Regions:
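Short, well-structured N-terminal submotif of metal-dependent ribonuclease cores
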Residues: 1-50, 64-80, 151-158
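Active-site neighborhoods of divalent-metal-dependent phosphate/nucleic-acid chemistry enzymes
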Residues: 2-13, 60-66, 85-132, 157-158
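Short aromatic/basic micro-patch
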Residues: 18, 49-52, 93, 131
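A generic structural signal for short hydrophobic patches within well-formed alpha-helices
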Residues: 24, 55-58, 99, 137
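A general structural signal for well-ordered alpha-helical segments in protein cores
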Residues: 33, 55, 77-80, 95, ...
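Residues at the C-termini of beta-strands that transition into short coil/loop
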Residues: 52-53, 95, 133, 148-151
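Short secondary-structure capping/turn micro-motifs that flank functional sites
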Residues: 118, 137-139, 153-154
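Active-site regions of enzymes building and remodeling cell-envelope glycoconjugates
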Residues: 141-146
Length: 158
């Protein structure tokens, strides 16, 4: 398309990470994966980001539990509120730029799911997605890392 504007996302110079729902949720387990715990402890607090979609995925889980396990749902809701407060400056919304990139990724990968929105968020902000589900992101071209296989004392990736 001659004369069409090429979409560019802003780029940062330092390695920052975007946690997916599974990695964030690991933090609240009674017996979390020690590799994940070690990895998260090794990261600078201001290098860890969440997608607003992660908040939505957790909220969906809370809603599913409300009729099945109301006390558990209440615990999750309280935990989610704490995560929102802790990560408030680091929760990334879906912007028009991210939505456009997501649209391109949908065609490229043949998948219209939330993982592509998370990948688009990471690509636009030059973040590495930290997830257990590496294969869900491979076709997007985003950098991914799985901390679940790390030994307890491990810490860095990238």
């Amino acid at each position: 398309m001659a004369g069409a504007k090429r979409f560019e996302c802003p780029r940062r110079r330092f390695l920052m990470i975007l946690l997916d729902t599974m990695v964030l949720s690991e933090r609240r387990k009674a017996k979390p994966n020690l590799g994940v715990v070690s990895y998260l402890k090794s990261q600078a607090p201001d290098s860890i980001y969440l997608s607003a979609l992660t908040i939505g995925e957790i909220e969906a889980g809370i809603e599913k539990q409300r009729s099945l396990a109301p006390e558990f749902a209440a615990e999750l809701a309280q935990w989610l509120t704490l995560m929102e407060l802790q990560f408030a400056p680091f929760i990334l919304p879906v912007t028009p730029a991210i939505a456009k990139l997501w649209g391109r990724l949908c065609v490229q990968t043949g998948n219209k799911g939330i993982d592509n929105l998370i990948a688009a968020t990471a690509l636009c902000h030059n973040l590495m997605v930290v997830t257990r589900n590496v294969t869900d992101f491979e076709s997007t071209g985003v950098r991914v890392f799985d901390p679940f296989g790390l030994p307890e004392a491990a810490g860095t990736a990238g």
